[in-house]
Amino acid sequence: MRIAFFLSVWLVCLGAVAAPNAPATLDRSTWPEQLTSPALFDVASRAEILAFAHALLISEALDENALKQRLGLKAINVDAIDNLRKQMWQRLLSNYNFAQQSCDQDASFCYYVDGMVSLREQAGKFAIADDSFYIAWAEPSREFHQRYLDEQLRKAALFPQISSEIALFGDQESNGDTMNDRLFLLTFDSGPTQSPGTTDWLADYLRKQSIRASFFVLGNSLQMRLDKSGGQAVQALYKDQCVGVQGWEYRSHSHWQAWQDSILRSVALVRQVLPDNYLAQFRPPYGQRREDSGAFFQGQGMQVSLWDIDAQDMAANLGAEESAQRVLSLMLLWRHGVIKFHDTQDKVRTALPWLLKATAQSGLGWEDC
């Protein structure tokens, strides 16, 4: 068993690592079962948790130089990486415990785990037999989890010099960590589009599905839409939805001298046009914001709203269904959280219906904004 584990470490070190601009995704057709019940969702969830835990454990065997090489960085924040790994292990343990609650209905991927030691032990020896019902999923899943883990480790390695959603700066910031099991919140960034556009289609689709999502608008895009369509049309557009801000324009708010003005102008416009929809939250573009911004947001009565699951729908090399499959794989792994799409991307017209159809019988809930 120890030989197999260290062979895995060696193969990871030798293998080509995806570039930071190549988001990880997993072809869900390699999984042999549809998620047609809460128990089958749990089976797939247990498998993804163990596969990711295996990748996480392997990464811990790399020294600092090997990790730099793997992530393609000259310098890394080792403390931030260690903190992220600890958080991931805690969440994996909690998630596996939730996923085990249906083991009496289907025992696939149910192993003895009563704490962190036994979880790490099971992760170390996790493997899919060649004659397994799940063998077609095994290698694509291994590749997905290694690439996804590298995405996250790279963000931690650069934090806080380059801020991102990977960690919180303080109490004025939030993500979906504290949400209940099987509960997810849909969020959409960077709109609105001009009429008629994807924002129109999306808001109408969500209303038909009885889902209230959070839209984080750009002030300049909202102003252009307002100038063209008028206030009543904009109010009709966002009916039954929540509207936060992403700043006046889509740019990093970490080193921009006018970052406060960007937020205040956007908030003023949303509160003027959409007072009943206003959500006192700021979604930083790229997740980049100032480490010392907490006092400002506290003074404005606002929260910085980050995310747990990134659809990566702005990536040119990721198709709409690939984006949806990435989201579903991460929903199985993390079991709750905030999902980020962009309503400026036409991909969401395909990705979101695919996602809702794939999870319709899985016993999931969509958080009300």
Regions found by a protein language model. Give the residues of each.
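Active-site-adjacent pocket scaffolds in enzyme catalytic domains
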Residues: P20-A47, E291, F296-W334
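Metal-dependent polysaccharide deacetylase catalytic core of the NodB/CE4 family, i.e.
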Residues: M116, R120, I128, S132-A136, ...
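Short, intrinsically disordered/low-complexity patches at protein termini
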Residues: A268-L269, S329-L330, G363-L364
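Short, composition-biased local secondary-structure segments
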Residues: P160-D177, H253-R271, Q325-R326
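Exposed alpha-helical structural elements
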Residues: F144, Q232-A233, E322, R326
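Alpha-helical, coiled-coil/dimerization segments enriched in small aliphatic residues
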Residues: D189-S190
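Terminal accessory/targeting
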Residues: R2-L185, G197, D204-A213, R335-C369
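Short glycine/proline-enriched loop/turn "hinge" motifs that connect secondary-structure elements
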Residues: G176-T178, A236-L237, M331
